Amino acid sequence: MKKIFFLMALLLCSVASYAGKQAVYLYGFAASFNDSIVYFTDLQTMAQAEIDRHNFLYGREEYSNQLRDYLAAQGYSHATCVTVWATSRAALEKKYQRMRSRYLMLANRRTKKNGAAPYTIKYLTPEEFSYTPVVAEKGTSTK
């Protein structure tokens, strides 16, 4: 019984200490069913992003909304946007390469079959688009 109590206390302490602000790496992806253009942002570093105790990026939907709003302002409306993040750059680069290669492979396969490229992949540089940190509201706790 004491061992179980000790393990539970240790687990709670480690989870509580993990929550808070830390550096995260993220990139964005956008696609639309109405268009054949697919957008990828560069990998970006967010120095003071908030991570809650369940290991989720606080305001993760707001990061996707930032990309959606930027693309809508550029005339690319109705985009479905996804923001992928990780706490290590190597893990994020692996996710980025996997998603990017999947779209390149599909585009090459369909180009050979039909003679026309089904996707146009565009890359957004940090000068064109960069994420801004989402700050936790006063009443909301990330811990």
Where are these regions (language model features)?
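Alpha-helical interaction segments
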Residues: M8, R53, Y119-I121
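Sec-dependent N-terminal signal peptides
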Residues: K3-V15
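Short linear sequence elements within intrinsically disordered, low-complexity coil regions
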Residues: L11, S32, Q44-T45, R68, ...
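Boundary at the C-terminal end of the N-terminal hydrophobic targeting segment
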Residues: S17-A19
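Generic structural motif
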Residues: I4, S32-N34, R89, P126
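Short aromatic-glycine-(Arg/Gly/Cys) micro-motifs in beta-strand/loop hairpins
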Residues: K21-T80
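Surface-exposed, polar helix/loop patches in the mature regions of secreted/periplasmic/lumenal proteins
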Residues: H78-K143
